[in-house]
Structure formats: C-alpha cells, structure tokens
Amino acid sequence: MASTPSKSSRSSKEAYSEVAIGPYTRLDHIGKGSFATVYRGVQTKSRTFVAIKSVNLGKLNRKLKDNLAMEIDILKYLLHPHIVALLDCLETNSHIHLIMEYCALGDLSQFIKRRDSLKDHSYTRHMISKYPNVSGGALNEVIVRHFLKQLASALRFLRDKNLIHRDIKPQNLLLCPAPKPAPTQSEAEPQIVPLKGSETSFTPAVGLETLPLLKLADFGFARSLPATSLAETLCGSPLYMAPEILRYEKYDAKADLWSVGTVLYEMVVGKPPFRATNHVELLRKIETARDRIKFPEENPASDDIKALVRGLLKFNPVVRMTFADFFENDIITGPIPGLAAEDVPIPDRPPSPEVIPTESAEPQSVSDTIYPRNNDAEPKEDRYPPPHRYVPHNDRPQTPTSSSPMRRTRSGDRPSSAKQIPPAAAPPRPEAVSHATAPGRQELIGRHSSEQQAPGTVPVYKNVDKLKEERELAAQEVAFERDYVVVEKRAVEVNAFADQLAYDPRFHGKQTGALPRRQTTPALPTTQASSQNSPRKAVQVVSGRSRADSAHNRHASYERRYGQSPTSATSAISKALNMASGRLFGVGFSPPLNIAKGGRSPPLAYNPFPAYPTGHAGLLTMGDGARAQASPDEDTRTVKELEECATRSDVVYGFAEVKYKQLIPLAPSSQSYNSPNAPGTNFEEGELTPDAAVTLSEEALVLYVKALSLLAKSMDIAGAWWMRKNRAEALGESSFSRLEPVSIRINKVVQWVRSRFNEVLEKAEFVRLKLLEAQRRLPTDHPSHPNNLSLESAGSGTSVDVMVSPGVTAEKLMYDRALEMSRAAAINELTSEDLPGCEIAYVTAIRMLEAVLETDEVQPSGKGTDKVTLDGVQGEEREVLLKLVSKIRMRLATLRQKLAVLAKRQTPPSSGKMIPSNLAHATPATPATGMATPR
C-alpha cells in the first residue's frame, strides 16, 4: 500500500462536506464502482468507522435492482470473520445506502500492485521486514498462503449455505490491518476503529493474527445454487471468469474455483494468468493454453502452490479440482512453512478455561490459538479517542432516510454463529489509506515506478519484452476497467445459439471454415475490442437479425462489411430515409432540426441488411450453381420468414440511426456506449437544447427497442427451425445434406442477427443514459422532467424503467415516417422525378408499416388476429394499416411496370437477352406477406 499521506496532501483530500445519513455521518469518497460510490463514514455517536456504499437507483435497471435486493438478503445472514458484514441498510428517494464493515487497507488488487511500497506503510512495515517480497514474484509465499487460507474459509462457509459468489477477484477481496498489531507500531500514530458486525468480525478463523485480515466482499452476483444445480447467467469480471461462463454454457459452483485459481496465480506472479483486450480473445487464449499453466522461470513459487493453481485452472469443469479436494489440500489444512520465529505456534501451550480452540483443520498453526478474552475490558470502540475532525450534528446537511426493515445488530446484541470466537483485546491501530467495500478500480499512480533492474544484468531484449508486457497490461486494463459484465439470460441464449450454428460442421461442408467467434461481441466498427462493455454499463440483452427487400437483387452472404467509403454505407434504406429527411424532416422533427447539421445520416457505420448490392444470387443454389426450384416447403418458408423479419428490423434500425446521428454528431466508432461521461461523449451540443436532446433520445430509444424485439423474434424463428431439424434428423426423417443451401443461408442470417443485436443493444444503452442526463437538465416544471412523469408513461420495452413522455412510441413514429415517405414518393412519381428513389421509398414505407404490424412473439399458424390487441395495435387500427400497405403496394406495382417499360426502351436492340437491373428483377408481392421470395 502507499505510504500514509502527508498532512498537506491529507488536508486537500479532506475538502469534503460531512453528510448525515441516518445515524451515520458520511465522510470522504474512497472508491467508485459501476453503480455505486463508496464513502468512508462513522457512526455518529461512537465515531467508529464504517464504509457507506451508496447505490444510485437511477442507474439500475430491473435486473440490477434484483441483484441488489439479493445482495442485501444474502449479506443479512452472512456472519463470518472473512466476509464483509452488512451493518445496516438505509434508503432514500434516490439512493440505497449499505453500511458495511470498514476495511482500512483497501483491496488485494492495490495491495499487489503497490507491493514495492508496503515497506513504507505503518500497517505493513513490520510484515515486510519478516516476509519480504522476493524478486520474480508478487507476494511472499507466507502471505499468499495466509490469504488463501482465509479465502478458503469464506468459501467453505458459502458452500455450507449452497451459495456461489460468481465474482471472486482481487478487487472484491478487502484487507484489514492485522488483528494483532506489530510491536513496532506507535500508539501516537493516527487511530482508526471500525464498527464491528459481531464480536468475532476481526478475529481470523484461520491464518496468522500478525498479518492483514482478508474479507470477501460484493455479493451483488451471489445466488443460492445447490450442488446439483446449474446457472446460465453470464456475470462477473472477464479476467477471472471461468471458461464455461465465457462460452455461455451452464455452470455450477466450480466456476468460483477457477476464479480462486486466477487470484492465487496473481498473488504469486503479480498478474492474471490470462490477459486480453476482450472476453473473446481471453477465451481463445485459455483454450490455446490447453491446461498448461506456465510460471515465469524466475518465479520462486513452490511446487505445491503451482500444482494447486494448475488443479484449479482446468478448462473442463468436470476434471477441475472439487471443493472437497480444495478444502482438504495440504496448503489449506497444513501449517504455513517459513514462518518467522515470533509467528511459529507454541505446541505445548496449556489449555485454559478462557481459551476457546477453533474448529480449523490446522491445530498446530497460530490461527488455531485464540488469545483469552478479557471479559472486564471495554468494547474496542470505547477504548479509543474519536478522530480529530468533528463537525457538530446540527452543522451538517441532512439526508432524510428511511431505514429498511433490516437493521443488523452489532457486537453482543445477537447470538454468535458457528465458528465464532471471542476476540482478544488489541492495542490501537493507526489509520491507513482506505479503499473499502469493493470500490471500483482506481487510477494506478506510478505504475512500476519502484521497480528497478540490477545494473548490467538485464539484456536489451528483456527491456523490449517488458515494454510489450506493459502495453498489453495497459490495453487489458482499459478494456476491463469496468467491474462487471452482466448479460441477461436472453443474451446468453442468443449468443450461444449463434455459436452453435457457427461451429456446427454440418454447415461447413463446402466452406473454407467456420465463422469467427469474434462476432459474439457487439458489431461496432473499428472498436470491436471494446464493444462488449456492459456492464459497467448496466445490463445487456442479446439477440438480432435483419434483411433486405425481396424485390431487389442482393448477395447471398449476410456477413457484415465495415467499409469506410461512402458507397459501402449507402443502401436503399439510407437513401429512402435521407430522401424523406431532406424534404420532410424540416416539419417532421419534433422539435424541428436541420438534418444537415448532424452530418451524414445514417452514419457511415450503418450497414443495412443485406446492403442491396449489385451482385445477384438466388435464394437456393445447388452444388453445380444452378438455380433450384424453391418449393414452398417448411424450410423455404422459414428462410423467407426469417429474412423478412430481419429486414423489418433493419428498416427500424436505419430510422433509429437517423435520430442517433442527430443526437450524437460524432461517428459511432469514436463513441463509448457506456456512460454519458465516457471519453468521446462530452460533446458540445451547440444549438441542441435539453428539450431537443430529450425528444431525440426518447425517439431513438423506443426505435432501438423495437428493433431489438424484431431481432429477438428472428432468432426465435431460427431457433424453432433448428429444433425441428435436430428432432427430425434424430428420428431419421431428414438429413442436413440435402438442405445444405437452406441451412447455410439461415446460419449466415443468424450470425448477422447476433452481430446487429449486440450493436443495437450498446447504442440503446447509451441513448438511455443520454436521455436520463437530458431529462435532469430540464427545468423542474417541464413536462418531461423525471419528477413530472408517471410510471404509466415509462417505456415498457426498455431494459430499465426509463420514463418517456406520454405518446412517444415506436409504432407512432414509424407510421408517421412511412406516411411521409409514401406521400413524398407519390408526388415525385406524378412528376416523373427520381423514379428509382420512389421505388425505394415505397419499399421502405411498406417495411416500416409491416414492422408496426409485427408481433414480438412467433404466432402459431392459423391463429386469428381480428379484433385483438397485438403489441399495442388494436384490431381496427390493424385494418387501417393493412389497407394503407395495400395501397402503397398498388402504387409500387404501377411504378415497377413503368420502370420496366423504361428499362426495355433503354435496352440495345442487338441484345438477344435483356440483362435485368436491380429493379427489373422485382416481382409482385405475394398476398400472404406482401413480399416475394428474395432473389
């Protein structure tokens, strides 16, 4: 840890205002996570220290609120010396304040990174003098074994309660000063006394009393998981995730053991065993290693430590070390070798009535000898004077709170649980630089500044390797700066299904290779390495698809192309939207905005489905390339339905991109879709007022959510087809060999859908945050201010309870835009102006109206839809929309006849066979769906 700051630096850090939160006083800020800010605080009466974790309810969606409630419920009953206790829980209108035990030494991550300065810290000076950090490693092995014993004790306690933590990492392992202070510590040094959750909160169950006490924190992802159960939600921190979680597979409590192995490796080596700039690359490195965990040659780790790490870091959870084997390992149960003389346990200590032996599995260690408790002594919090700085209660700003039904009693006010030992009276401890209750990563100050090389002993190539390693580490920390990755169950299902199809050998009989897994990440151009941001973004939901109008020729491949030229981003949809924008957006926008100010719209990153290319490819081709007669069988209908649904989603996506581009005039490739305060998003809005920002954000958000629902339905269609094919093949009724063209095409659409869904999800989350930010900047009397919006107006399709203005719906926006585009196209058609553009506008309007009529669920065949409500579209309204679509199709058919005549006139007479153009290939729409089979 860094040395204690000087008075001058400390005075600058104390420039904060004390805030009363119930019976506690909030002091300085000590850490920040994705959704919470951690403050140091004190109990107002006793002046004992606590950590106050303030969670901003406005940043939480429904899933994260459930996680928070689960965390509170779990922590209420977790009373263990090596688990951070929840002391109290207070709630206000905007925040929930978790009052936690205060851990003055911060987290294990900072402890490892600042290991070279531990010798200068008053809390750790004596420890380092006894157990110095050796060259080529991170922490002394005595300290490593001590921390591992305490972590294992916490995990054993959780397993006894059928709990899985799911986010074990150094940042969630907090450290407290040694329960038995070093004899060299001066009583004149600054003193700090934490408020205890129980009498045994700071009495180690295992390990040494002369070394820091480790506590497991942050149970936001913890859940009850019996030994025979499997979970499927992807959560945790990527660097410490088990590979089965990274692969979107179901997992059990053994996922925690992988995380323990990564933490143990980092304590020994100083860095995680696998590092990468994104979770897909991380999984690739884990798979490539093939269970060969390498340690640096100069690392002095013992063989049994290396064997334990390798047993924990098994790729296959079936062959990974079990909890029983881990808890019975000699490193966990045996004595710690290499102890200093003062820490060696006394073997023949006579028993005393006041000595209570622990139930630990290592009777010969110091951790099993609990010093007698002086029952006549005062509680610790009454033995020490309060801190010097004190503000009278009346002078502090008040924060009205309402205590939750749970308020944890402290010290002797409740019965002790199993394995709880009365603590020994300890002398005062000085204050340390604090970092408590699992705060987020802080900036690293002077990284590697204390590392020195012996002169004349390091070759030049080692310096180059060191520089490369530092760059890789920097890139990794930027990519994983966010604490969490949270993916909803739907996201896991979609990505898992897309991966299953991508790697199925039956789809690649005549292809050069499988599709790359990297498309699992959101398809954000030029920033794919950092696109899987979540979390610390809030929540991610995954699914997706899209396609082009059947009346146009296109490539059969649906793989995305991220060209930077204007032509690569130009499509029929973008042309149609731009045409309508140029003529109608001046009055169609609310509030009116000049689209030219936002630059190109849709932005250059927009790649439509399937981009309306000039090449021609049929729906189904046989092995010799000849066109097959597409029979209206079930598989052909599935392809048609899948592509139509994907195309509708793409039209909605293009409309949302227009709004997004006006809201954020920068290219999406330069954006970070995590937070309104993220780098690259603090743009000067210029003439974009808060009212305009709210309007654009609301419209973009509801359109993105509509696109997500259509993409999800596309994946459901493909999933149902996949289940039918597997069932039929298992029964011997069909074979994939004769359906290879269909299956390959569906596979490509699924991969496109997955990529587009991830991209839309990221942008929707960013727009949501921009909406919340813009709403807060509105005047309090504005109708769109959060205080003036009711729950009834909240967007029902969003991933969180975002309050949008009444009447702002995707269906209304899409209907108005389709009507504007069709009217403008009709006027141009009458004046014979830009007839190809008129066709594009008609097709886009039809697709947009079909998206309005589209339901979110796959409807069974033959189910009536008359006089029913479907996704907010009433039966009568549905009839009106169907009539409008029919009229636009009639105009489209008339226009295509006119275009065919013009194309025939322009054909040279010498040509014996007319070469059809993109428009000439169009066929009349089928009555059932309004779409012909794509050609």
Curated annotation (Swiss-Prot):
Belongs to the protein kinase superfamily. Ser/Thr protein kinase family. APG1/unc-51/ULK1 subfamily. The keyword Nucleus does not apply. Its main location: cytoplasm. GO terms for cellular component: Atg1/ULK1 kinase complex; autophagosome; autophagosome membrane; cytoplasm; cytosol; phagophore; phagophore assembly site; phagophore assembly site membrane. It comes from Emericella nidulans (strain FGSC A4 / ATCC 38163 / CBS 112.46 / NRRL 194 / M139). Homodimer. Forms a ternary complex with ATG13 and ATG17. Residues 397-406, 922-935 have a biased composition (Low complexity). Residues 342-437, 508-569, 905-935 are annotated as: Disordered. This is Serine/threonine-protein kinase atg1. Coiled coil: none annotated. Keywords: ATP-binding, Autophagy, Cytoplasm, Kinase, Membrane, Nucleotide-binding, Protein transport, Serine/threonine-protein kinase, Transferase, Transport. It is a peripheral membrane protein. The active site is at residue 167. It catalyses: L-seryl-[protein] + ATP = O-phospho-L-seryl-[protein] + ADP + H(+); L-threonyl-[protein] + ATP = O-phospho-L-threonyl-[protein] + ADP + H(+). The gene is atg1. GO terms for biological process: autophagosome assembly; cellular response to nitrogen starvation; cellular response to potassium ion starvation; mitophagy; piecemeal microautophagy of the nucleus; protein localization to phagophore assembly site; protein transport; regulation of autophagy.
